[in-house]
Amino acid sequence: MTLSKAKAFWQLTRMNRPIGSLLLLWPTLWALFLAADGIPDWHVLIVFILGVVFMRSAGCVINDFADRKVDGHVKRTANRPLPSGLVSSKEALILFSVLVTCSFILVLTMNTLTIMLSSIGVLLAIAYPFMKRITYLPQFVLGLAFSWAIPMAYAAESNQVPPEAWLLFVINAVWTIAYDTQYAMVDRDDDLNIGIKSTAILFGRFDKLMIGLLQLTVLTLLIALGIQLSLPSLYNWGVLAAAGCFVYQQWLIKGREREACFEAFLNNNYVGGFIFVAISASVLI
């Protein structure tokens, strides 16, 4: 394998852009630390961290495979490995299969319930990129895909998926829809020209309002989670910090400029981090 080919594979898996892995990792850590009362099993923790990296990379590969014929017409994606010809469709599918296989080998070390749940996660990862041609709600499917590690984490730690896990699942799914709508705002003009659907297009001139309502829902459900689990007041400071991030994001997207919308999307890494610190500190007290 040449250096240029290796670099193309690296770019195809987005290893050079870890924001997606972080946005997938944070809710996974929320779930692991809550399910384990602050001290997850080290083996489970390692498996899920590696699983996040492998499956996020696999999701990027299958996404670019699905978009290979349209990415060349979008300014932001025209130079990606598949539309530029640096990686063939066959090579992309082989890489996707390798990444999914690695993830499956990892999950085989977990209990039966976790293994069963993992199959749904793979289907969601495959389905998402193709939803952009079918529905204006592909972000809803992404929300499910990016949240599926939550019930898996609970299953791995406790061999059950309690109601709190599904509340956390909904919180993360709604948050994902909000931040991926910001991401979709970056490409909205290009997507309209090539027929790609998104919530950014669906919401239209109400995009900022809808993102705000989604963010308000996230904060409300986070407070409800804290009440349900009797988390200390320290937890609320994390929720308040997340609220501050959401206010900042609303300021960024006010003019709907591409760079500002992308910066708002990136800012969600801090939201995930603040909530993780709040959860982990609260359950360890």
Swiss-Prot record:
<dbReference type="GO" id="GO:0005886">
    <property type="term" value="C:plasma membrane"/>
</dbReference>
<keyword id="KW-0472">Membrane</keyword>
<keyword id="KW-1003">Cell membrane</keyword>
<comment type="function">
    <text>Catalyzes the prenylation of para-hydroxybenzoate (PHB) with an all-trans polyprenyl group. Mediates the second step in the final reaction sequence of ubiquinone-8 (UQ-8) biosynthesis, which is the condensation of the polyisoprenoid side chain with PHB, generating the first membrane-bound Q intermediate 3-octaprenyl-4-hydroxybenzoate.</text>
</comment>
<feature type="transmembrane region" description="Helical">
    <location>
        <begin position="93"/>
        <end position="113"/>
    </location>
</feature>
<keyword id="KW-0808">Transferase</keyword>
<protein>
    <recommendedName>
        <fullName>4-hydroxybenzoate octaprenyltransferase</fullName>
        <ecNumber>2.5.1.39</ecNumber>
    </recommendedName>
</protein>
<dbReference type="InterPro" id="IPR000537">
    <property type="entry name" value="UbiA_prenyltransferase"/>
</dbReference>
<dbReference type="InterPro" id="IPR039653">
    <property type="entry name" value="Prenyltransferase"/>
</dbReference>
<keyword id="KW-0460">Magnesium</keyword>
<dbReference type="Pfam" id="PF01040">
    <property type="entry name" value="UbiA"/>
</dbReference>
<keyword id="KW-0812">Transmembrane</keyword>
<dbReference type="InterPro" id="IPR044878">
    <property type="entry name" value="UbiA_sf"/>
</dbReference>
<feature type="transmembrane region" description="Helical">
    <location>
        <begin position="134"/>
        <end position="154"/>
    </location>
</feature>
<feature type="transmembrane region" description="Helical">
    <location>
        <begin position="233"/>
        <end position="253"/>
    </location>
</feature>
<feature type="transmembrane region" description="Helical">
    <location>
        <begin position="265"/>
        <end position="285"/>
    </location>
</feature>
<keyword id="KW-0831">Ubiquinone biosynthesis</keyword>
<feature type="transmembrane region" description="Helical">
    <location>
        <begin position="33"/>
        <end position="53"/>
    </location>
</feature>
<dbReference type="GO" id="GO:0006744">
    <property type="term" value="P:ubiquinone biosynthetic process"/>
</dbReference>
<dbReference type="GO" id="GO:0008412">
    <property type="term" value="F:4-hydroxybenzoate polyprenyltransferase activity"/>
</dbReference>
<comment type="pathway">
    <text>Cofactor biosynthesis; ubiquinone biosynthesis.</text>
</comment>
<feature type="transmembrane region" description="Helical">
    <location>
        <begin position="209"/>
        <end position="229"/>
    </location>
</feature>
<keyword id="KW-0997">Cell inner membrane</keyword>
<feature type="transmembrane region" description="Helical">
    <location>
        <begin position="166"/>
        <end position="186"/>
    </location>
</feature>
<dbReference type="InterPro" id="IPR006370">
    <property type="entry name" value="HB_polyprenyltransferase-like"/>
</dbReference>
<comment type="similarity">
    <text>Belongs to the UbiA prenyltransferase family.</text>
</comment>
<keyword id="KW-1133">Transmembrane helix</keyword>
